[in-house]
Amino acid sequence: MANPNNIIRPSAFSSNERPVPSERHDLPEQHRVDMSVEQLTALIGQTVAQVLPGLIKQMNNNTLDFTDVSDQVVEPEYRNNLADFDRVPDIVKSIREFSGNPAEFGSWKKSVDRIMETYTPFVGTPKYYGILHTIRNKIVGSADVALESYSIPLDWKAMSRCLTLHYADKRDITTLEYQMSTLVQGHQQSVEDFHQDVYKNLSLILNKVGCMQMSRESEHFVTKMYREKALDTFIRGLRGDLPRLLAIKEPADLPSALHYCLKLENQTFRSNHAANKGQQSSFRGNEKPIPAPRNFQPSNAFGHRQPPPVPPRHPMRRPPQYLGQPFPAPRQHVSNFGNAPFIPPRQNYQQQWQQYNAPPRPFATKPQPRPEPMDVDGSVQTRNINYMNRPHSDINKRQKNYNIQTVNMRQPSIEVTGSSSSMTGYQRSMQDYETQNNINSTLNEYCDGQIDNLDSEQRDHVLHFLE
């Protein structure tokens, strides 16, 4: 019975028959070389030693020779149908611009590499040409100047090599690896900060690997190797018991190692907090607190006694001071406490202030400028003396009142023509008013003309008479 499923029967494993080897096709006699294993190994090693340095040098020293590279064009079979030329995918439009920042070059290049790898089957189509043209327009600033200075064609590999030469990390991968291996956690550094330092160096190494020209399998292997080295650096550089605890957990990568560290730190903190709280509660239950002495003065963290407080500059209630005498001494016998040290009484606030604080410095008065005499025009000067503007002559004298108000004084009877019996009361009052005005006007004219020519004594008599 035939075996329809082509399954190897168990009897085939138990039999002693061995499969017949296939027929060997030997080389002709003129091409056959007898060589031992040692000679073959030496030949392979010699070949690798000759070829490998050239490959490494070519990989590290990227020469911008694009003589064999031309612009990407549309294939002839698609030139009659350019409907897909403007149909650029949104994922390509969402790529951010690159202006020449070296810190952003690694991530930007990886995002473009993923897109270009996805649309590789569309090479030569109008759609691929539109995608490549959109990516070229995303390169602006100094990066655009670098591409134009080398006349880089419209090809992504050529543009990637030029940008890598200008904006990739100039340190070789060996230097970056050594710098990462020397990292340790500082005394005042937290676990999160140390993890951030290790991850930053790992990112630099991975960006350098991404800029190298290698196959995808090689890049994946190198990336995995450096991730393991970063994890080993993080575990070895931790302080305390964390390295031994992480060795038991065996984390797979850096994020899981950080998770275990934070978890162990939180557990240690809770255990220490509970232990300290239990010790404090037992101490309070067994022993009674010792009362402080009467003259106890608190001390600071360094064990030194703090100076007594300084009174305010302007207290609301100043204590009485009896001619600089100190306060009366307090009672020295204390019955409630033991042999407490006696501290002498404090002096008054004024002496204490002078002891702990320097006396205030007097304010320096700013020198005032000397007054300058006023310029007087000689043409307006006069020799006439104005006694009204001499204030020094009126010292110890009665204040003068120049605002003279006339008072209607009763005048003596004046004989008038005509019969007085025939004049009415209104006419008499009008006549008296006119007579008084004439007298006042005469006195004012006399005063205006003669008061300036009188001496001080005569002027006082006249003014007294007018009052």
Curated annotation (Swiss-Prot):
Location of this chain's protein in the cell: Virion
Main localization category: virion
Ranges for region Disordered: 1-27, 272-351, 358-377
The keyword Coiled coil is assigned to this record: no
Coiled-coil features, chain-numbered ranges: none
Domain of life of the native organism: Eukaryota
Bias type Polar residues, positions: 1-17, 272-284
Swiss-Prot/TrEMBL keywords: Transposable element, Virion
General function of this protein: Strongly basic protein that binds directly to retroviral RNA and may be involved in its packaging and in the reverse transcription process.
Name of the protein this chain belongs to: Retrovirus-related Gag polyprotein from transposon HMS-Beagle
Organism name: Drosophila melanogaster
Lineage of source species: Eukaryota, Metazoa, Ecdysozoa, Arthropoda, Hexapoda
